[in-house]
Every structure is written in C-alpha cells, then in structure tokens.
C-alpha cells in the first residue's frame, strides 16, 4: 500500500518488461491477475505485473460481461454512458483506480445540472495504451 503515490506508474513505464495496472474494481483486478498468470507462466513471456490496489470502501459491481475483458487488458473500456433528455453536448470522462468514482459523480452532475451526455471510461492502464 503506497499512500499518495502518484508517480509509481510513471516510473514503471521506464521498464520495458513491466505491465502496470490501476484497476478500479475487483473484477478488473481478477481479469488482470488471470492475464498475468497466463502471460508469465503459460505463454512464458518475459514480463511482470505492477498493480495498485486501494483500501477505500466502495461498491464493487460484477463483471458487466465478457466483452470488457479485452479492454481491461489493453488499458481502457467504456464503463457507463449517460444521455439525458435534450442533451446537445457530449464529453468523454476517464478515470482509473478510486478516481473512477469521481468521474462517475462528475457524469451525474453533468447530466442532471447541464444536460450533457457522457461516457465514463475505466482506464485500467495508461501505460498499456501506448
């Protein structure tokens, strides 16, 4: 557990064999761990996984479907879309780890107060997006 550590993923990007992830939900963590075991022990890839996990207490949804697995491993997938009646504008919101909850709160404010449509993306790994 590393409190207020905002730079470890930046440092991990400098190591070619390191795959760094910042999951928001337990199902994301499970998918990443399963992929890590397959990569390192089944396929014999020269890599290791760096995972950040948190101790903040919040609801953990179930895996929304098999369709999100690829996005979790590749680093990003759409988590939730909201389109209020009369929406004329649309934004994309990104979040990882516990910050994803703040993106979801922002999504609700944008919909309720400003009638702005949005999609929240769960970014499980910014480094894997490169």
Question: Where are the model-predicted features located?
Answer:
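Extended active-site and interfacial segments that coordinate phosphate-rich ligands
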Residues: 10
């Amino acid at each position: 557990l590393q409190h207020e550590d905002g730079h470890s993923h930046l440092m991990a990007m400098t190591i070619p064999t390191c795959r760094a992830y910042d999951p928001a939900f337990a199902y994301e963590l499970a998918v990443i761990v399963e992929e890590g075991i397959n990569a390192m022990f089944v396929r014999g890839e020269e890599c290791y996984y760096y995972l950040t996990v948190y101790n903040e207490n919040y609801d953990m949804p179930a895996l929304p479907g098999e369709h999100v697995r690829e996005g979790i491993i590749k680093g990003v997938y759409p988590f939730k879309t909201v389109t209020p009646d009369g929406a004329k504008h649309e934004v994309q919101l990104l979040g990882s780890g516990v910050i994803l909850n703040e993106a979801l709160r922002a999504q609700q404010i944008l919909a309720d107060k400003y009638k702005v449509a949005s999609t929240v993306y769960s970014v499980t790994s910014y480094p894997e997006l490169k």
